[in-house]
Structure formats: structure tokens, C-alpha cells
Regions:
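Conserved active-site alpha-helix within GNAT-family acetyltransferase domains
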Residues: 109-123, 269-287
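A conserved beta-strand-loop-helix scaffold within acyl/acetyltransferase catalytic domains
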Residues: 178, 191-238
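…primarily DNA-binding HTH/wHTH and HhH modules…
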Residues: 280-306
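Acyl-donor-binding surface of acyltransferase catalytic domains
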Residues: 41-42, 48-168, 292-293
Length: 306
């Protein structure tokens, strides 16, 4: 694997990965932001060029200084040759197995291959599979048409649905970094200093969205990550069941479409209310699903998990 640095090569790779949506969404979304300023300081590895078979995005080495920060230490993968993936992942030049880290992807059939490498490294692997949701507009990015983004914008705008919540005097707007603690305190996978730092970084660099109450406080929100995935969606308990999330997401999707930003999300298997909500917004579940592996070296296995 070697680094792909030239902007025009990254643009070619990005266009090529669009043809493999939804399986390529994690790396596709990462590269989308890399070629637009790279605020998270990520880098792209391929096994060959231009006929690549494997793509990995990861933080630059100087970003991965905290061995116990899996929010930062995250790798996104896409492979056309799953059988060759173990050989790639076992290389210390590709993956730092001495850290706690995440691997994320949107392809079936990689669990056994990743776990086989993990066994050889004597690390603990925690695997999660969830439903991957995209809109019809994202699926149309698979087109090789040069006006791909314009088509995405037109289709997405047509598919936007209107919702009105049951609460008056609310205002849809972008999240501010001052809202980070509120988001962190209500994120199932957050509630710690490392996640707070990560959330602040996301809100500072990518458009998050919320509904404000009459006093200007967020009551429903969502955050965009470096892969263009929308995560951390939440509505305060006293406002749940009143259409808040629907209205916020409708405004958020409209904003992203106006900015020509692709987006997707995932939902946990048992969260039936969220499944219904995203379907009403025009999202469709993808057969490939959303996958995450958390790797923990032996020296950290007795410590509290995040």
C-alpha cells in the first residue's frame, strides 16, 4: 500500500469509488472532504494505481498520537479483493495495532478476515453491524455522468419532504461548537473527554444541524463526520414524539443538498422508531449494511472501555 497524494489522482479515485456506492461510501465520503481542504488531516492508501483493488483512509501519523483515542484512530476500508485484505491489514505500515482503533466499512463478508488478522496480533475485537441508509440521490452518484453532483442536487431536492413539529417557536440552524458538551452528554458512544474533543472537531469543520427552542437552546440535532456520515442524532426526552427530529432532519437535508454535500447514516437493528423516522425522510436500507470493528491491544484490555 502506498499514499496517494496528488489532487487530480484523488479526484479520479473519488469518481471511480462512486461506481461502487453504497459499499464504498465510507472511503468515498472521506475523500470528498480530503479534496476539499482535508480538515481532519486524513490520507489515502491504495495497493496499486490506477487499477486499485484496495483503498484505506486513515489519519495522518501526527494526528494519531493518543493510543487510547479510537475516535481519532479510525480507518475506513473498501476492497475489491476481500481475500487479499488480511495480508494488507496485518502490515504495521498500514495499521497501528498497538493502539485502540476502529475500522469502518460498508461491505459484507469482511468480519472473519479482519478477526483472523486480529487473532494473529493478540488483540480484542468488538464487532458491530447496523443498517446502512442512503437516499435515492446518493445511489444516483454511481452514474459516471460529469454532472454527477448537479444530478444529486436536483434529485435530492425533489425528494425532500416537509414536516411540521407540534412545538412552536423553534428555529432550525447550524450547530455551534458551544453545543458540543450537550451533544457529547447525550451520545450513547460518547460521554468522555476524547469523544468531546472529537465532537468539537466535527462541529468546527463540518455542518451539523439542530432545532433551537424559544430560548435558543438545541432540542434536536445531528452531526456530520469526516466521512459525510450523519451521526449522533438525538432529541431531548421532553420533546420526543413531537416531530422534532423529522423537522430538524428535513431542514438539515435541504441545507446539505443546497451545499451539494452527500450524506448517509446508519441505524441500530433494534431501534425501530429510528428506522421508521429515516424511512419517512426518504432513506432506504442498503443490503451491504454498516460495519465497525474496535481493536483493543492486551495492554489496554483491563482499562474501562469507551
Amino acid at each position: 500500500m502506498f499514499l496517494l497524494r496528488e489532487v487530480h489522482m484523488l479526484q479520479i479515485l473519488h469518481q471511480s469509488l462512486a461506481k461502487s456506492i453504497p459499499e464504498s461510501l465510507k472511503v468515498y465520503g472521506s475523500i470528498f472532504h480530503i479534496i476539499r481542504g482535508n480538515p481532519f488531516k486524513l490520507e489515502v492508501l491504495v495497493d496499486s494505481w490506477p487499477d486499485y483493488q484496495n483503498v484505506i483512509t486513515r489519519p495522518q501519523k501526527e494526528e494519531m498520537t493518543d493510543d487510547m483515542d479510537p475516535y481519532t484512530n479510525t480507518y475506513h476500508i473498501f476492497t475489491k479483493t476481500p481475500d487479499k485484505l488480511p495480508e494488507i491489514l496485518e502490515s504495521s505500515k498500514v495499521i497501528n495495532w498497538d493502539q485502540i482503533f476502529h475500522i469502518q466499512g460498508c461491505q459484507q463478508g469482511l468480519d472473519e478476515k479482519i478477526k483472523s488478522v486480529a487473532a494473529s496480533k493478540s488483540v480484542q475485537i468488538d464487532y458491530s453491524k447496523r443498517f446502512l441508509y442512503t437516499t435515492e440521490a446518493i445511489q444516483q452518484l454511481k452514474s459516471s455522468n460529469k454532472k454527477m453532483i448537479e444530478k444529486f442536487h436536483e434529485t435530492a431536492t425533489q425528494n425532500t419532504r416537509k414536516f411540521k413539529s407540534e412545538v412552536d417557536n423553534r428555529k432550525p440552524t447550524l450547530l455551534d461548537v458551544s453545543h458540543s458538551e450537550l451533544v457529547n452528554d447525550n451520545w450513547k458512544f460518547g460521554k468522555n473527554e476524547k469523544s468531546l474533543r472529537y465532537i468539537k472537531r466535527c462541529i468546527q469543520n463540518f455542518p451539523g444541524y439542530c432545532l433551537l427552542d424559544s430560548k435558543g437552546n438545541p432540542i434536536s440535532w445531528n452531526v456530520m463526520e469526516a466521512t459525510c456520515e450523519l451521526r449522533m442524532a438525538y432529541t431531548l426526552p421532553e420533546y420526543q414524539g413531537k416531530g422534532m427530529l423529522q423537522e430538524m432532519m428535513n431542514a438539515y437535508m435541504k441545507y446539505l443538498q443546497e451545499k451539494n454535500l452527500p450524506y448517509f447514516l446508519h441505524v441500530e437493528d433494534m431501534n425501530e422508531n429510528s428506522h421508521k423516522a429515516v424511512r419517512r425522510l426518504g432513506f432506504h436500507a442498503m443490503p451491504c449494511d454498516w460495519h465497525e470493528w474496535k481493536s483493543t491491544p492486551k495492554r489496554f484490555q483491563q482499562l474501562p472501555h469507551f
